């Protein structure tokens, strides 16, 4: 009985590991293709999101901010995305998708705090 439970746990972990590898591969392909074929890059992102939902895994942090949450376009700063730093209230990065106009805000307070600690 214990062996069956261990095997199930191992299978779940293995499936999640494979899913994360595939997601990473799809995002890497999207990054390569995005400049000359944005539609194909968008399809790669959509496939990665489908895998993520099916396998119930999180998208790796390095890819999470590289696509538009609304239209699933792979974002390239200066081409189809505008990136701005804002310091009012709480310091944050503003990424605007130039395809659909969606605005994403990400705080960077943690980085500012680390910088202050190093300065003192």
From Swiss-Prot:
Keywords: Cytoplasm, Endonuclease, Hydrolase, Metal-binding, Nuclease, tRNA processing, Zinc. One of its GO terms (molecular function) is ribonuclease P activity. Binds 1 zinc ion per subunit. It is an enzyme of class 3 (hydrolase). It is found in: Cytoplasm. Its cofactor is Zn(2+). Changing residue 69 to A: 10% reconstituted RNase P activity. Signal peptide: none annotated. GO terms for cellular component: cytoplasm; ribonuclease P complex. Belongs to the eukaryotic/archaeal RNase P protein component 4 family. Part of ribonuclease P, a protein complex that generates mature tRNA molecules by cleaving their 5'-ends. Binds RNase P RNA. This is Ribonuclease P protein component 4. It comes from Pyrococcus horikoshii (strain ATCC 700860 / DSM 12428 / JCM 9974 / NBRC 100139 / OT-3). The gene is rnp4.
């Amino acid at each position: 009985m214990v062996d069956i439970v261990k095997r199930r746990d191992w299978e779940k972990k293995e499936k999640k590991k494979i899913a994360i590898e595939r997601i990473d591969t799809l995002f890497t392909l999207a990054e390569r293709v995005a400049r000359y074929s944005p539609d194909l890059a968008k399809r790669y992102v959509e496939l990665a999101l489908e895998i993520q939902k099916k396998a119930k895994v999180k998208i790796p942090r390095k890819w999470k901010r590289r696509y538009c949450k609304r239209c699933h376009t792979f974002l390239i700063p200066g081409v189809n995305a505008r990136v701005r730093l804002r310091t009012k209230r709480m310091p944050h990065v503003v990424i605007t998708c130039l395809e659909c106009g969606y605005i994403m805000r990400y705080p960077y307070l943690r980085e500012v705090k680390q910088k202050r600690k190093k300065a003192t």
